[in-house]
């Protein structure tokens, strides 16, 4: 696991860009961001535990940092400043030290019940200190001993240890598995207990995907919880990267990215955000070069609804998304982490680097990607565009995992399957509730899309299995969701999604309207040719859709209430010559009225 700062605020402040970064922290001069033998984990250290045996191929092994590689002390506050946080750091230093930020250590320790006196943090309102009085009964089967023969301990983490084991009987008799053993004595807070309960629930719900480590069952007794998983003996993705000299060829990187994107798109469709994606959390099933890749370690994962935002800071420093640090994020944060992995695969270095966690966070928030240093000049323009669109700091402009599989760099690979994208239904919901004027504006914009830009929308439309006359209805969406959902999602999320699209119950939608409904304006805005798209779309809108409109009528179409100063907000949306929408008004209509614009007008 990575960092965990669990102090969510009721109302996340999107404008506070330094929530987790001590303002007086500084970093070193430009250093090497090349990937070291092991990534830096940031949990609090437990000095009373013996070091675990190294086992890089088990799903739950969480290695401690290699202390012999790093200096013992963090740099003092006020140490020499780092290179500019506005550009990707250069690669001049062989490895970064683990130096955890103190506030993160304290929060991790508090979450898992091992706070040291000098690191104690203020308990959250609903948090219980100590293990006394906590209900540590999970309702799991108590027959672990009768079903499994336990082998040697092969790894020890901060919250448990891992053993090899074998099935004693049944259809899997003699099969090796990995067993994560979590001592109940370690569960000294209500949060820690809930973490275990949620992890098992998520593993049980997601099991079955080819690129996800298989979950067999969970057991418990008076002292431990036992989570039985598939044994993966091919090693970590990180180890494969290092064995190849630090980077992959483009073709080999594509093969890895397709598997990662497939499983993450699957998780997101089921309403699960992983929150700790990194090379260490992907294992190969076997040592074969073409072995399947498996996602592991759902200890920080959580459920998230389509319109919900999470606000607790979790993950691993090098892979954490900017919006996580802003305490307002969703599934897009996983895509950022995939972008970091793709950057590492293609060049062997991390895109954001500093000597401390707070320095890394500052780089994540402020640094701009650079593709000037070797080997980037020799990397294809499609691959660089792929990485850029995953590492866009604005989560609204970032590709989804399903969209990334439709990117020109990847989409022509062999045996690729395009998954259903939850974003389509979120955008359709907004479209169905939009005014006729905004729908006309979106239809004009959709007519400017290129063949490559239409590819993703065509694949999504095909997955909805339209009728022979090329239309879809609510029933098509229902059947598509049922085909692509786990049993857990069928029971919980499908109905909610269908209710939000209830307007399609009484009408049908053709592909042309679907493109307008499922089009992301923000993602188009991230493209270099956005200005061209917008100008062409406005010309089309002028011919078919634009009309004279009063500010009051426009405010009504946009759903602005009487308390909003509509003339101050919308005065530049309308041309004074003929009362029609201006180009600026058209572009703003595509986005809708922002709360920032309203606040500024007030």
Curated annotation (Swiss-Prot):
Pfam family, one: Pkinase
Domain EF-hand: 451-486, 487-527, 528-563, 564-602
Region (3 X 7 AA tandem repeats of S-[LI]-P-X-X-D-X), start-end ranges: 20-40
The protein, known as: CDPK-related protein kinase
Enzyme Commission number(s) of this protein: 2.7.11.1
SUPFAM superfamilies: EF-hand (SSF47473), Protein kinase-like (PK-like) (SSF56112)
CDD domains named among the record's database cross-references: STKc_CAMK (cd05117)
Biased composition (Polar residues): 19-34
The keyword Nucleotidyltransferase belongs to this UniProt entry's keyword annotation: no
Record remark on domains: All EF-hand domains seem to be non-functional.
Domain Protein kinase: from-to ranges: 148-410
Lineage, broadest ranks: Eukaryota, Viridiplantae, Streptophyta, Embryophyta, Tracheophyta
Protein family per UniProt: Belongs to the protein kinase superfamily. CAMK Ser/Thr protein kinase family. CaMK subfamily.
UniProt entry keywords in alphabetical sequence: ATP-binding, Kinase, Nucleotide-binding, Repeat, Serine/threonine-protein kinase, Transferase
Catalyzed chemical reaction(s): L-seryl-[protein] + ATP = O-phospho-L-seryl-[protein] + ADP + H(+); L-threonyl-[protein] + ATP = O-phospho-L-threonyl-[protein] + ADP + H(+)
First and last residues of every Sequence repeat: 20-26, 27-33, 34-40
EC class name: transferase
Annotated spans, Disordered: 1-59
GO terms of molecular function: ATP binding; protein serine kinase activity; protein serine/threonine kinase activity
Active site positions: 276 (proton acceptor)
Binding-site residues for ATP, renumbered to this chain: 154-162, 180
InterPro entries membership: CDPK_Ser/Thr_kinases, EF-hand-dom_pair, Kinase-like_dom_sf, Prot_kinase_dom, Protein_kinase_ATP_BS, Ser/Thr_kinase_AS
């Amino acid at each position: 696991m990575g960092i965990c700062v669990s102090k969510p605020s009721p109302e996340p402040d999107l404008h506070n860009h330094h929530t987790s970064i001590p303002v007086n922290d500084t970093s070193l001069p430009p250093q090497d961001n090349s990937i070291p033998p092991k990534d830096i984990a940031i949990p609090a250290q437990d000095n009373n535990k013996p070091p675990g045996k190294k086992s890089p191929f088990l799903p739950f092994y969480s290695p401690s940092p290699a202390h012999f590689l790093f200096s013992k002390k963090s740099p003092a506050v006020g140490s020499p400043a780092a290179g500019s946080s506005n550009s990707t750091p250069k690669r001049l230093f062989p490895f970064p030290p683990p130096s955890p930020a103190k506030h993160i250590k304290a929060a991790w320790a508090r979450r898992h019940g091992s706070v040291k006196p000098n690191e104690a943090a203020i308990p959250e309102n609903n948090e219980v200190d100590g293990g006394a009085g906590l209900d540590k009964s999970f309702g799991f089967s108590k027959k672990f001993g009768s079903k499994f023969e336990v082998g040697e301990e092969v790894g020890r983490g901060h919250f448990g240890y891992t053993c090899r084991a074998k099935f004693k009987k049944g259809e899997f008799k003699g099969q090796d598995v990995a067993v994560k053993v979590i001592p109940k004595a370690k569960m000294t807070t209500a949060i820690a207990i809930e973490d275990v309960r949620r992890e098992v629930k998520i593993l049980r719900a997601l099991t079955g995907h080819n690129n996800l480590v298989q979950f067999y069952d969970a057991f418990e007794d008076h002292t431990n919880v036992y989570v039985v998983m598939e044994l993966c003996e091919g090693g970590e993705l990180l180890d494969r990267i290092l064995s190849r000299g630090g980077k992959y060829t483009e073709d080999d990187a594509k093969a890895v990215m397709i598997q990662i994107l497939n499983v993450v798109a699957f998780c997101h469709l089921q309403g699960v955000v992983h929150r700790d994606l990194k090379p260490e959390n992907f294992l190969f099933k076997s040592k074969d070069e073409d072995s399947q890749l498996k996602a592991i370690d759902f200890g920080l994962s959580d459920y998230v609804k389509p319109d919900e935002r999470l606000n607790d800071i979790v993950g691993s420093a090098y892979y954490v998304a900017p919006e996580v640090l802003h305490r307002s994020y969703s599934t897009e944060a996983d895509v950022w982490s995939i972008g970091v992995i793709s950057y590492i695969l293609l060049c062997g270095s991390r895109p954001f680097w500093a000597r401390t966690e707070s320095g890394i966070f500052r780089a994540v928030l402020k640094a701009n990607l650079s593709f000037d240093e070797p080997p980037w000049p020799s990397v294809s323009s499609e691959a660089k565009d792929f990485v850029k669109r995953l590492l866009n700091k604005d989560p609204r402009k970032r590709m989804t995992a399903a969209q990334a599989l439709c990117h020109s760099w990847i989409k022509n690979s062999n045996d690729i399957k395009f998954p259903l994208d939850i974003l389509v239904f979120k955008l359709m919901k907004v479209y169905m509730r939009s005014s006729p004027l905004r729908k006309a504006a979106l239809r004009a914009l959709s007519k400017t899309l290129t063949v490559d830009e239409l590819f993703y929308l065509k694949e999504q439309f095909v997955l909805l299995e339209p009728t022979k006359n090329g239309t879809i209805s609510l029933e098509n969406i229902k059947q598509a969701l049922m085909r692509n959902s786990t049993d857990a999602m069928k029971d919980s999320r499908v109905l909610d999604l269908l209710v939000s699209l209830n307007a399609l119950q009484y009408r049908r939608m053709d592909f042309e309207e679907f493109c307008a409904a499922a089009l992301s304006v923000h993602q188009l805005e991230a493209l270099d040719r956005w200005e061209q798209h917008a100008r062409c779309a406005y010309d089309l809108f002028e011919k078919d859709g634009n009309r004279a409109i009063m500010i009051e009528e426009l405010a009504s179409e946009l759903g602005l209430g009487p308390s909003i100063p509509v003339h101050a907000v919308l005065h530049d949306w309308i041309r004074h010559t003929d009362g029609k929408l201006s180009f600026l008004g058209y572009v703003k209509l595509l986005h809708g009225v922002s709360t920032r614009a309203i606040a500024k007008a007030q």
